[in-house]
Amino acid sequence: MVLTDSEMEFIRKELGRDPNPLEYGMLDVMFSEHCSYKSSRPVLGLFPTEGEDVIIGPGDDAGVVEITDELALVIGIESHNHPSAIEPYGGAGTGIGGILRDIISMGAMPVALLDSLRFGYLEDQKSRYLFEHVVRGISDYGNRVGVPTVAGEVEFDENFQLNPLVNVMCAGLVPKNDIKRGIAPRPGDVFLLMGGRTGRDGIHGVTFASEELTSSSELEDRPAVQVGDPFTKKMVMEASFEIMDEIEVSGVKDLGGGGLTCCISELVAKCDNGARVSLEAIPLREEGMTPYEIMLSESQERMIFVMAPDDVEAAMEICRKYELPAAVIGEVTDTGRMIVESEGEVIADLPAKLLADPPVVEREARKPQLPEGQVEVKHPPLKDTLLKLISSPNIASKRWVYRQYDHEVQIRTVVKPGDDAAVLRVDGTTGVALTVDCNSIHTKLDPYGGGAASVGEAIRNVVSMGAWPVCIVDCLNFGNPEKPEVFWQFRECVRGMADMAETFSTPVISGNVSFYNETEGVTVNPSPVVGVAGKLSLDSIKTLDFKDEGEEIVVIGETGPELGASEYLRTVHGIVDGKPPETDLKAEFEAAKAVKEIIDGSGNKVTAVHDCSAGGIAVAVAEMAIKSGIGARIDPMKIPGRFRNIHEALFSESNGRYIMTVRGSARDILGGLDVPWAVIGTTGGRTLEFGDVALDISELDDAYHGVIEAYMST
């Protein structure tokens, strides 16, 4: 139970009485951090949420933007961190199920999944166990429901050892005239519950997600983890689309965190309406369930449709066709109250808005001590450094992960996992580039800069594909907001993200906040996972691999002496410290704008584009060479910027940088740009040369591939 003394005082004042046990349970889940966003709501208001392409912004199950004249892109992101720490296979699978239902409830067909995963170092046996079973849970669920997992990211750090992070993004497509909403606007309409039966799994799941984990959580909190069923989910998807095609439903919403209590109260509260719910009508999986268990159950694969009574039989016939339990469980009223009945007796009577719109909490924020300067280290030989970096699990190939996913199903995937972003076909000429990114180390050491840089990196990844960002979604993973230092991190991170989004005039249309990611006093690195969707023409797609020999290699953007918080320091020196790279909002925007203009205006003369992030320029060029099998000769001293030595030139993670290759003269193509750029080398041969240091492509390939496979075979 999480209701505080002040919350109970507020509730008593609103009701004029004490809540009964069922009402207390309903209020408890709705006042949880997971459902109410009571700590984060005042801060989330910093995000820009409006734009000319925005159809539905934050506040519904997912955000919606126009992507063509006829179609809308529906996109959302969710976390399933606590359940995945307790039961990794089931927790990850039900995370997939939840975000799929969010997209379906907007009327959209899910077309892509992306995942952002964080675990402890793979030397740790428990971390390997969690990693293996989370990936298997994602792949089994996604593959069985027929939705491709097309991109993602994985990070390993000791601060995720006890508390992994499992974030999942989903995108869907829907004709603009067929978009649905999570509302119940018409009194007299009824609630049709369909899908999986209601059982005892997941009770108090949202309360569990709003508390720190402990050493006993794995045993004590296992009942709070929901049980997924991908086969039923597939049937629910098919039946849902048939119902929405054939019946004029006035509202649709999935049952996720908070179960029936959350779903129905939110449906009616948005329209200042009320609800009357009859418990005996609800299809149950288990005998003897109490009203408390029924109203708080988070059993999976359930949907609520709001419709006129005359349409019920047609909907029931569709459910029978798919052999799915379904029942009318109540009706929309004009009272503004949520009333629960059992055997004709009223057992709960609460204002719907009290449930759906709890008061916010003003948290104390206090700045912790942060690094102000750079870390001085002795630099090892360049060749050894690069080989160690690209064989780090944080940089090495993630094919062990994505080869378990079906990324081809639905045949929309144009650019597959392993590039800067995935590209999906929307129609014959239009594509959408999708990515998720985060830099938890930068955010830990500079929350404002790390938040801004995470948005910047995600935007760079879609721009590198030839797209321009149309919307942002976010999943904000932090520790206990009751701790002033944690809440300061959160506030500053959101401020940085909002400033970068505002600079690009790109709206944040949906998101999720996951607090209390702490176990036994260890707080996860603050992790602002950013999803970006970009629109592009299918005939202008760029990929990161070198295409031919004799092409000029260009760097756009400046490199500074910024090894602080870098993957170089973490991997080579075992140091997580130092001031992260500066974030120049204007420079980030101008570089992205320049790259997009070059791609669009140069015909096919730009042959490859890659964003520069973890590991710096050396790693980015190595990845381009490894993927193509073509070598390159680089002169580090030609890199534009201010650096003191070759290691700073090659491994600094300065923001706002791109690497591209061009056919012909770079000066002819880039000469008019008003951003820093320089030709730093040419492609060719079977070695990668940085000055007088040369590495065979085969040696780089061996170091880059098979790293995670080797860990997971132990």
Swiss-Prot record:
<keyword id="KW-0436">Ligase</keyword>
<feature type="binding site">
    <location>
        <position position="254"/>
    </location>
    <ligand>
        <name>Mg(2+) 2</name>
    </ligand>
</feature>
<keyword id="KW-0460">Magnesium</keyword>
<feature type="binding site">
    <location>
        <position position="78"/>
    </location>
    <ligand>
        <name>Mg(2+) 1</name>
    </ligand>
</feature>
<feature type="binding site">
    <location>
        <position position="102"/>
    </location>
    <ligand>
        <name>Mg(2+) 2</name>
    </ligand>
</feature>
<feature type="binding site">
    <location>
        <position position="474"/>
    </location>
    <ligand>
        <name>ATP</name>
    </ligand>
</feature>
<dbReference type="GO" id="GO:0005524">
    <property type="term" value="F:ATP binding"/>
</dbReference>
<comment type="subunit">
    <text>Monomer. Part of the FGAM synthase complex composed of 1 PurL, 1 PurQ and 2 PurS subunits.</text>
</comment>
<dbReference type="Pfam" id="PF18072">
    <property type="entry name" value="FGAR-AT_linker"/>
</dbReference>
<feature type="binding site">
    <location>
        <begin position="79"/>
        <end position="82"/>
    </location>
    <ligand>
        <name>substrate</name>
    </ligand>
</feature>
<protein>
    <recommendedName>
        <fullName>Phosphoribosylformylglycinamidine synthase subunit PurL</fullName>
        <ecNumber>6.3.5.3</ecNumber>
    </recommendedName>
</protein>
<keyword id="KW-0963">Cytoplasm</keyword>
<dbReference type="InterPro" id="IPR016188">
    <property type="entry name" value="PurM-like_N"/>
</dbReference>
<feature type="active site" description="Proton acceptor">
    <location>
        <position position="80"/>
    </location>
</feature>
<keyword id="KW-0547">Nucleotide-binding</keyword>
<comment type="similarity">
    <text>Belongs to the FGAMS family.</text>
</comment>
<comment type="pathway">
    <text>Purine metabolism; IMP biosynthesis via de novo pathway; 5-amino-1-(5-phospho-D-ribosyl)imidazole from N(2)-formyl-N(1)-(5-phospho-D-ribosyl)glycinamide: step 1/2.</text>
</comment>
<dbReference type="Pfam" id="PF00586">
    <property type="entry name" value="AIRS"/>
</dbReference>
<dbReference type="InterPro" id="IPR010918">
    <property type="entry name" value="PurM-like_C_dom"/>
</dbReference>
<dbReference type="GO" id="GO:0004642">
    <property type="term" value="F:phosphoribosylformylglycinamidine synthase activity"/>
</dbReference>
<dbReference type="GO" id="GO:0005737">
    <property type="term" value="C:cytoplasm"/>
</dbReference>
<feature type="binding site">
    <location>
        <position position="514"/>
    </location>
    <ligand>
        <name>substrate</name>
    </ligand>
</feature>
<feature type="binding site">
    <location>
        <position position="512"/>
    </location>
    <ligand>
        <name>Mg(2+) 1</name>
    </ligand>
</feature>
<dbReference type="Pfam" id="PF02769">
    <property type="entry name" value="AIRS_C"/>
</dbReference>
<dbReference type="InterPro" id="IPR036676">
    <property type="entry name" value="PurM-like_C_sf"/>
</dbReference>
<feature type="binding site">
    <location>
        <position position="37"/>
    </location>
    <ligand>
        <name>ATP</name>
    </ligand>
</feature>
<keyword id="KW-0658">Purine biosynthesis</keyword>
<feature type="binding site">
    <location>
        <position position="511"/>
    </location>
    <ligand>
        <name>ATP</name>
    </ligand>
</feature>
<dbReference type="GO" id="GO:0000287">
    <property type="term" value="F:magnesium ion binding"/>
</dbReference>
<keyword id="KW-0067">ATP-binding</keyword>
<feature type="binding site">
    <location>
        <position position="101"/>
    </location>
    <ligand>
        <name>substrate</name>
    </ligand>
</feature>
<comment type="function">
    <text>Part of the phosphoribosylformylglycinamidine synthase complex involved in the purines biosynthetic pathway. Catalyzes the ATP-dependent conversion of formylglycinamide ribonucleotide (FGAR) and glutamine to yield formylglycinamidine ribonucleotide (FGAM) and glutamate. The FGAM synthase complex is composed of three subunits. PurQ produces an ammonia molecule by converting glutamine to glutamate. PurL transfers the ammonia molecule to FGAR to form FGAM in an ATP-dependent manner.</text>
</comment>
<dbReference type="GO" id="GO:0006189">
    <property type="term" value="P:'de novo' IMP biosynthetic process"/>
</dbReference>
<dbReference type="InterPro" id="IPR041609">
    <property type="entry name" value="PurL_linker"/>
</dbReference>
<feature type="active site">
    <location>
        <position position="34"/>
    </location>
</feature>
<feature type="binding site">
    <location>
        <position position="226"/>
    </location>
    <ligand>
        <name>substrate</name>
    </ligand>
</feature>
<keyword id="KW-0479">Metal-binding</keyword>
<dbReference type="InterPro" id="IPR036921">
    <property type="entry name" value="PurM-like_N_sf"/>
</dbReference>
<feature type="binding site">
    <location>
        <begin position="298"/>
        <end position="300"/>
    </location>
    <ligand>
        <name>substrate</name>
    </ligand>
</feature>
<dbReference type="InterPro" id="IPR010074">
    <property type="entry name" value="PRibForGlyAmidine_synth_PurL"/>
</dbReference>
